[in-house]
Amino acid sequence: MIDVTRHTVLIGAAAGFGEIDATGPAQAAPPLGGMEPLNSTDGVFTPSKGWGIQKFSFSNPEPSIQFAGLLFAFEVISFENNFGIDPLAVTIERRIDRVRMAGTRLRWAGGQESKAGLVSAELRLTAAGAIEWAVEAAIDAPIKAIKTIVRGLPRGRISLAAEAWCDFGDDEQVFEYPALGGGMATPLAVVEGHDKRFWGISALQTEVRPARFAFLAGPDGYKTELVYEPGAWERPQAATTCKWRIVAAPDFASVAKTHFDWVAKSWQLPDFQQRSDAPDWMKKLALVLSLHGQHWTGYVHNDFDQQLEILRWTAKQIDPRNVMVFLNGWDGRYYWDYPRFEVGARTGGEVAFARLVRKAKTLGYRIAVMFGSNVARRNDPDFPKIADARLRDGNGDFFPANYVDWDGDRKGDGFMVFMNLAVASWRNHLRERIASIVSRFAIDAYFLDICGLWENNCDGDMLVGTRQLVDELAQRFPGVAPIAEMQYDAQMGFIPMSHVPRYSLYPQANFGVVASFNHLSFPAPGGGSTGIHEYGFGRYHPVILDQPQIPTITFVDDTFTTQREAVMSDIATAKQRFAARGGRT
């Protein structure tokens, strides 16, 4: 009898894809205190028909309430166990446009055991037709995460963070905002249903916290798990999630606009042309020259004198006042010599570096210099002074950084470790190294490598630490601008330029707020070398007239000597693009 009820409920939810209806058809009251007796294997392929994620090896109870054509269940997760709602200890209040659920006992061990605890949620239908809710939970142990389980969303291809569509078929997938590996630059997932409606799922955040989106395929739709984590450094025994939103629309742009309107308001994102933290020159860039110096192995692509020769030649092709020079590999062996951030000897030393910057600025160029925002070599002699800032995850374990094969042994190397800008020792060290280079050499901008890494951890909010670093440098060096790599939405409010544009399906959310240029690894003309970057080689793409990001030319060892015609062609196209944009970035 229960299996029939579950199947009927799931089919009914699937049939409600076309609209969000708060009332729904008249139905018999569900059993168990007004909740549907579903479990974790209901509505999903078990075992998975495609690639599967890890999950419980039994049917874990997921008692669910119906609202607006969808089914919702809730769990609270401590650092020791998973707890679901006891449906016999629940009160449910329904109104025409909302439902409130409050549970006073929790079940664990697959429903075999119970304990005291509170979980409550209010789901409401907004005037615009969206479902919004937040979940409150309280238990007698630190809360690790709070999960909402949604059934009834259609299957279809998925866009994550307004990036390219992917059809995952029967594969189960998990994505996270704003994690480093495969992370989302904004907490938005959109499903294009078979009815051609677009279903947007947003985490409406006012502080950066992990938001995970899991999609488990079934015959009639997705079971979608939405996971929120409070700050692991807080270890709260009572927590409230961010607000979640589900909205359906006839086109992707409508869903994206709704989400990014919230993002702009929440993080106070300015219009790029009006930004006070973007200097005037940054708003009038036609070109970025990415000049590669010393590789991890010690191989030098271009020393400082060669870089100056490149800049002198380029100044005859384009007005240097509209060109930013991005200096990377200037500080010794790339990554190996982090976090000293001192001028490398093999590329020419301080005298040659000072000459390069001075003469480049005399020509009219603007100079940006690369720093690692959260990477250090653990066997550096000075590492003990900053060792307390080594990044630990929410469980207290060191966050791994051994994913790059630097030395060619076909295995990731472990000499580098991730650091946490929320910790004063690292933030102060990095601030003083940036300040030293900026003040001594009159640098115009500083680039923060891997700035977009945010990990829930035991020591503090990495966004807050990053913003504090930027604010302190702005006070000391007005007009010297920060540049972010892997930028996520919240950082756009205080960092005006990024290294790779975001939101390709809704580009105005990026280019209306920040300027962007191509990545350090953007392949050079000719053989496609990525210079000091570990990728090695890629396919070179010439500059095109309608590209939204600032044209970027990578100079490696042979670019200036063998690829000058390709460079000249790219510069000519960049000038045409700049003119067509009215002299604006």
Model regions and ranges:
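Carbohydrate-recognition beta-sandwich/jelly-roll modules
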Residues: P31-M324, Y335, K359, L363-I367
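N-terminal secretory signal peptides and thylakoid transit peptides that target proteins
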Residues: M1-G16
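Aromatic-lined carbohydrate-binding/catalytic grooves of carbohydrate-active enzymes
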Residues: A286-R431, F441
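Glycine-rich, histidine-containing beta strand-loop boundary motifs that form or position
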Residues: V135-A137, K147-V150, L327-G329, V369-S373, ...
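C-terminal segment of N-terminal export signals and the immediately downstream linker at the start
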Residues: D3-V4, I20-M35
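Active-site neighborhood of glycoside hydrolase catalytic domains
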Residues: F418-M492
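Glycan-recognition surfaces
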Residues: D382-S425, A474-T585
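Flexible loop/turn segments at secondary-structure boundaries
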Residues: D331-D337, N374-N379, L453-N457, D489-G493, ...
